[in-house]
Amino acid sequence: MAFASLIERQRIRLLLALLFGACGTLAFSPYDVWPAAIISLMGLQALTFNRRPLQSAAIGFCWGFGLFGSGINWVYVSIATFGGMPGPVNIFLVVLLAAYLSLYTGLFAGVLSRLWPKTTWLRVAIAAPALWQVTEFLRGWVLTGFPWLQFGYSQIDGPLKGLAPLMGVEAINFLLMMVSGLLALALVKRNWRPLVVAVVLFALPFPLRYIRWFTPQPEKTIQVSMVQGDIPQSLKWDEGQLLNTLKIYYNATAPLMGKSSLIIWPESAITDLEINQQPFLKALDGELRDKGSSLVTGIVDARLNKQNRYDTYNTIITLGKGAPYSYESADRYNKNHLVPFGEFVPLESILRPLAPFFDLPMSSFSRGPYIQPPLSANGIELTAAICYEIILGEQVRDNFRPDTDYLLTISNDAWFGKSIGPWQHFQMARMRALELARPLLRSTNNGITAVIGPQGEIQAMIPQFTREVLTTNVTPTTGLTPYARTGNWPLWVLTALFGFAAVLMSLRQRRK
């Protein structure tokens, strides 16, 4: 009785919400304890039972603050190291980001208790998953979005991974919320029926993991080499280091020419404008073509626009076998989804003078088109994404083509040091390979550089913070997963049906 009385206190529930939210971080890499996702979501739902809407909103906010405060604290590393501001200000900015993201979980909990106040099957199994899908969409869309720490990613090695090629990672989010709600209902009501339904729902997708939505093409197997330059972020944009950086990448690449069909350098490996490096690029292109290899590299490009100003792009270009390199070549990719404050500054004229954090190197990029053709290198078709873009499942899928041989992502996670951020980023990249059933080539400055198989499995990788080359044979695949064909539309239809049913049934119950 004493415990029952204690748990009814709002302050205790707020504290528990913080703890359950923080527990959710364990579901993601590098911890990979996927049951933590269910425990965390179950805690969120259970703590909002029998609460008024404002109380539930506060619980949802505290839960979100626990999740994001522990799960994205890696942002502090880049702010503290490169932001040029006092320690208390750095901490405040991280707290502010976590608090902002927590508004969406607070919105979820508050609306859920406002529209479906009773602790029923309707609330946990129908209303909650649909509402969660909407609030998670808003978190990934408003102010360019930040869809980090979606619990579906915890299943990349879990029992529900087979659902990803069928309906995408967001469908796993949906099912996890439903299962967690039913478990919370079973616990609070001490009723075995919701428990049985939860177990059945959780088990149903398990056989899907054994379906192969792709066909390997062993006759097209190639040797791929990815150069991990391990250039310290503090030196990366130092003009005096440019020549040394080029030497590091060239010296690692020269022995690979004629052996590896495809060589990959990471994001902005060439830390200079493309137009300034024409002699180097043309000489390297000629050497690669002579030896039958191709190179894909990150670089910075600046083009004069119609207003007679320069647009600067975070770019991928190709060199080597095939048509000679040309600055006018369309065989390039310009990053579309830019990171706020890292690659562009909102309210630039106001914020830039305030602190060095708002004036970081290369923080004035322009956007490339949302849809861009695949890169072609040595007859290989590559659907590309730069850094942050790989976490945007729908955008990667929209750029995917049936003739894509591989997914390609290049990145520079040196901003975040030895934190958990790069591992979470890597986990999300793996999900893209699983959703689209294509091998994924991930080349980074200091890790995690890896080859991911078409079922999201790690085929080869090299350690972080080392100057190494990952060389391995990779077999392309063909075939389209249901998710590749339809995207998130089936899930949104399901969300609309669940939402409509939840509202209709709630209205009927109130009339009785």
UniProtKB/Swiss-Prot annotation:
The chain crosses the membrane at residues 14-34, 57-77, 91-111, 168-188, 194-214, 487-507. It is a multi-pass membrane protein. GO terms for cellular component: plasma membrane. It is found in: Cell inner membrane. SUPFAM superfamilies: Carbon-nitrogen hydrolase (SSF56317). The keyword Lyase does not apply. GO terms for biological process: lipoprotein biosynthetic process. Residues 227-476 form the CN hydrolase domain. Gene3D superfamilies: Carbon-nitrogen hydrolase. Disulfide bonds: none annotated. Keywords: Acyltransferase, Cell inner membrane, Cell membrane, Membrane, Transferase, Transmembrane, Transmembrane helix. It holds the Pfam family LNT_N. The active site is at 267 (proton acceptor), 335, 387 (nucleophile). It comes from the Bacteria. Pathway: Protein modification; lipoprotein biosynthesis (N-acyl transfer). InterPro entries: Apolipo_AcylTrfase, C-N_Hydrolase, C-N_Hydrolase_sf, LNT_N. Belongs to the CN hydrolase family. Apolipoprotein N-acyltransferase subfamily. This is Apolipoprotein N-acyltransferase. It comes from Escherichia coli O157:H7.
